[in-house]
């Protein structure tokens, strides 16, 4: 069984997405394949709870490593599970090992072709779509087909000569208008085949194309005043729009194909490999390469294609790639770089898995070495803000006042991307009267950095000012007077659009909302707000208490401080009972205070 330390590293990094997981034993053999709507929750359940089932307990004891494949939906996970179980025949999978398969939908190769669900795939020229994750889903698709199109359900031999002989009579389906009666010659082969062509599109998932087609027809019929036909088109559009495909289907004509995708970070290239066979994904593997100087992604992917095809003995006749690599293919091998369609969807699935693999590797590295995560963040900030050095020490300033009363300011400090609360500073604004944020910023920046330089204390690697161009200009001018321009970079964050301003640059930088750099800067700003507003509230409360308590005889400075510390506000002091006040400041003072406040 895997150790607790190994599990603590692996399990928290698993994605909370649908997919399939594979358990391997000490020999590297797949012993179990499962599907999950949420991979992290499902896999964790094997290790974090007791199992009554003896087979499951034995399985868990034999697990030595875990791999997974991310897909788009729970339905896809079910399909992929089926493919992987058939490929590896894992010892602990008791279902599906007998070769039982999920249903497909077939369009038979025959006159007026029948369309129905089947588990029996025959090489008779018929077209198969699927497999579908369960009979209910296949039947649901057939129900949609039959609601839209009047197709036959009988098993009659509808060759032309037999129809001409008049050997058949219409059935109930004809009378309830679910079939147009090709058996008695009421529907031509061309008209029926036109419906079958549209059904192919529907089974391939091309719903949007069908909806567009029916909209165009509806418009044309309306203009020609053919309202009955227009109404039929409208009903078909509504049926299609209500139906939502819950899984991606690998068409059966995509067979024996290798799919490769590429991702990279500063030092490593990641290449994901998927092999498609018989309409299913039966192998997924991600390879890592240590990047060398001046080695292009084309060269790395080309090398990986050769290695992975040899390792897994692939004889795929087609290779799907994200970009041209210059890889030399044999005469019998086709290279495809898809822009749309089913192969593009497969490439996107491979790209999703390689991106998840890279993310999980980073998370596991951070689990083992939290300092690496912090270093990664500050280097990201350096890159995004074009700084000369990584900002390991950042200071952020915020002013706080209400209509110019009790003006204060706060400075919060982040070190290695995290708050360093012991270094936070509060400031009373001393030289500014009235609401003047720019003048307040000049005073605080001047006082703070004059002290740091005079006492030879370390300067920050970056200053963040809460506010737009005006606040930034005020702080920049003050740093210039102190001779610190060029020594400390400074930026301003405008709150409305989260724009980042640089001194003397009218064009702001707008980072992606998911950017780690923006998240750190927002955290700085929010922390400065919180710290500054809290300080301002305390100052106002003290002033309020002083103003209301100053004229009460016998209540001195020390008593006021005790009252503020305990009750936090004048309102609470006023609502307190005399006994509660007595317990804090004594009976005599409590009586004076209680009576004095009520006179007011």
UniProtKB/Swiss-Prot annotation:
GO terms for biological process: nucleotide-excision repair; SOS response. The UvrABC repair system catalyzes the recognition and processing of DNA lesions. UvrC both incises the 5' and 3' sides of the lesion. The N-terminal half is responsible for the 3' incision and the C-terminal half is responsible for the 5' incision. It is found in: Cytoplasm. Residues 208-243 form the UVR domain. GO terms for molecular function: DNA binding; excinuclease ABC activity. It holds the Pfam family UvrC_RNaseH_dom. It comes from Porphyromonas gingivalis (strain ATCC 33277 / DSM 20709 / CIP 103683 / JCM 12257 / NCTC 11834 / 2561). InterPro entries: GIY-YIG_endonuc, GIY-YIG_endonuc_sf, GIY-YIG_UvrC_Cho, RuvA_2-like, UVR_dom_sf, UvrABC_protein_C, UvrC, UvrC_RNase_H_dom. The keyword Cytoplasm applies. This is UvrABC system protein C.
């Amino acid at each position: 069984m895997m150790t607790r330390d190994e599990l603590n590293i692996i399990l928290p990094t698993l994605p909370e997405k649908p997919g399939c997981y594979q358990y391997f034993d000490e020999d590297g053999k797949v012993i179990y394949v499962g599907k999950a709507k949420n991979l992290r929750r499902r896999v964790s359940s094997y290790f974090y709870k007791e199992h009554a089932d003896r087979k499951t307990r034995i399985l868990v004891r034999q697990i030595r490593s875990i791999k997974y494949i991310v897909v788009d939906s729970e339905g896809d996970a079910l399909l992929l599970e089926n493919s992987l179980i058939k490929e590896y025949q894992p010892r602990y999978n008791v279902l599906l090992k007998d070769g039982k398969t999920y249903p497909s939908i077939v369009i038979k190769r025959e006159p007026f072709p029948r369309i129905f669900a089947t588990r029996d795939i025959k090489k008779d020229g018929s077209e198969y779509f699927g497999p579908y994750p369960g009979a209910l889903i296949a039947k649901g698709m057939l129900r949609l087909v039959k609601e839209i199109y009047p197709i036959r359900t009988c098993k009659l031999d509808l060759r032309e000569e037999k129809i001409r002989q008049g050997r058949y009579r219409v059935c109930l389906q004809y009378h309830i208008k679910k079939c147009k009666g090709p058996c008695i010659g009421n529907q031509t082969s061309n008209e029926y085949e036109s419906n079958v062509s549209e059904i192919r599109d529907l089974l391939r998932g091309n719903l949007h194309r069908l909806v567009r087609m029916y909209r165009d027809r509806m418009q044309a019929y309306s203009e020609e005043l053919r309202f009955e036909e227009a109404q039929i088109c409208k009903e078909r559009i509504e049926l299609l729009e209500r139906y939502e495909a819950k899984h991606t289907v690998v068409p059966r004509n995509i067979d024996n194909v290798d799919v490769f995708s590429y991702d990279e970070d500063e030092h490593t290239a990641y290449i994901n490999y998927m092999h498609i066979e018989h309409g299913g994904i039966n192998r997924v593997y991600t390879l890592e390469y240590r990047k060398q100087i001046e080695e292009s992604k084309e060269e790395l992917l080309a090398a990986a294609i050769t290695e992975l095809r040899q390792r897994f003995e692939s004889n795929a006749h087609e290779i799907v790639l994200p970009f041209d690599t210059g890889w030399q293919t044999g005469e019998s091998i086709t290279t495809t770089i898809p822009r749309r369609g089913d192969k593009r969807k497969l490439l996107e699935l491979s790209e999703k898995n390689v991106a998840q693999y890279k993310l999980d590797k980073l998370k596991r590295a951070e689990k083992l070495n939290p300092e690496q995560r912090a270093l990664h963040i500050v280097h990201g900030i350096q890159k995004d803000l074009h700084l000369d050095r990584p900002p390991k020490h950042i200071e952020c300033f915020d002013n706080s006042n209400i209509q110019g009363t009790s003006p204060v300011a706060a400075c919060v400090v982040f070190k290695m991307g995290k708050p360093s609360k012991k270094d936070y500073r509060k400031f009373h604004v001393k030289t500014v009267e009235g609401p003047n944020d720019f003048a307040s910023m000049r005073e605080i920046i001047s006082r703070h950095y004059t002290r740091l330089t005079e006492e030879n204390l370390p300067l920050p690697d970056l200053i963040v000012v809460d506010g737009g161009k005006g606040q930034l200009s005020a702080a920049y001018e003050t740093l210039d007077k102190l001779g610190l321009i060029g020594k400390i970079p400074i930026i301003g964050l405008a709150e409305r659009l989260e724009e980042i301003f640089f001194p003397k640059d009218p064009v702001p930088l707008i980072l992606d909302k998911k950017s780690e750099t923006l998240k750190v800067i927002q955290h700085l700003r929010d922390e400065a707000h919180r710290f500054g507003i809290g300080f301002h509230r305390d100052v106002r409360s003290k002033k309020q208490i002083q103003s209301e308590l100053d004229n009460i005889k016998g209540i001195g400075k020390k008593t006021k401080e005790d009252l503020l510390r305990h009750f936090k506000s004048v309102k609470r002091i006023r609502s307190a009972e005399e006994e509660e006040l007595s317990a804090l400041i004594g009976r005599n003072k409590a009586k004076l205070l209680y009576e004095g406040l009520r006179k007011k």
